[in-house]
Structure formats: structure tokens, C-alpha cells
């Protein structure tokens, strides 16, 4: 589950009539049609759980939430997600390198 402040943002932005709509005659049981023009989504997560453990123990629920439940409403959006871990044992140098990596990925995915 994302932090509460992020969950609040998602609830405000990803809502019927703004981000998606149900087709006429569909009261919400069908597949919504995306309204947003975004065709690319990038998510960065931090974690104290190694990816291997996340996958084996939990099946990577954050991937499912972000890719399928949230950005899946955009249709065929190019989705990219990267997790940086383990935060609790990381060094300042390692965290600085993560930020450099984030900058490089953003520049690659959203060229100016």
C-alpha cells in the first residue's frame, strides 16, 4: 500500500470522469475506458525488502497495484518501475547514486 499522502493523490487524480469512464450502460462492472492522454508512466519505490524476497513472499503487489490497477486505466501506457533497496542499510553515497539513476531514467523516458 502506498503512503497515505500518495494514496490521497491517487484517489483525487485517478477517478471516474477525470481519468476514466465506464461505457454507456455500464454501471461499473465492466472495463473502464481511459481518458488521460499520458502514454508513459514511471514509478520509483524504496524498500527495506530485497526484490527476491518481495517476489517470493508477496508476489510483488506494488507492481500489480501500479501497473494494472492505476496505470492500467491509461490503456497501453509504457510502464516502468524501479525499486531501490535496502534503504535501512544504505549509505549516503548509495542513496546519492540512486538519485543519479532516477535522473538518468527520467531523462531517458521523458526526453526534452
Stretches found by the model and what they are:
Residues 1-66:
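Helix-loop-strand module that forms the ligand-binding subsite of alpha/beta enzymes
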Residues 53-112:
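Glycine-rich phosphate/pyrophosphate-binding loop and the adjoining helix
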Amino acid at each position: 500500500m502506498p503512503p497515505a499522502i500518495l494514496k490521497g493523490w491517487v484517489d483525487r487524480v485517478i477517478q471516474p470522469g477525470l481519468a476514466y469512464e465506464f461505457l454507456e450502460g455500464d454501471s461499473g462492472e465492466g472495463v473502464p475506458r481511459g481518458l488521460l492522454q499520458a502514454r508513459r508512466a514511471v514509478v520509483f519505490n524504496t524498500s527495506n525488502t530485497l526484490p527476491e524476497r518481495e517476489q517470493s513472499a508477496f508476489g510483488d503487489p506494488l507492481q500489480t497495484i501500479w501497473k494494472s490497477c492505476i496505470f492500467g486505466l491509461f490503456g497501453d501506457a509504457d510502464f516502468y518501475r524501479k525499486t531501490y533497496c535496502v534503504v535501512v542499510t544504505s549509505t549516503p553515497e548509495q542513496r546519492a547514486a540512486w538519485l543519479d539513476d532516477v535522473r538518468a531514467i527520467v531523462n531517458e523516458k521523458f526526453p526534452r
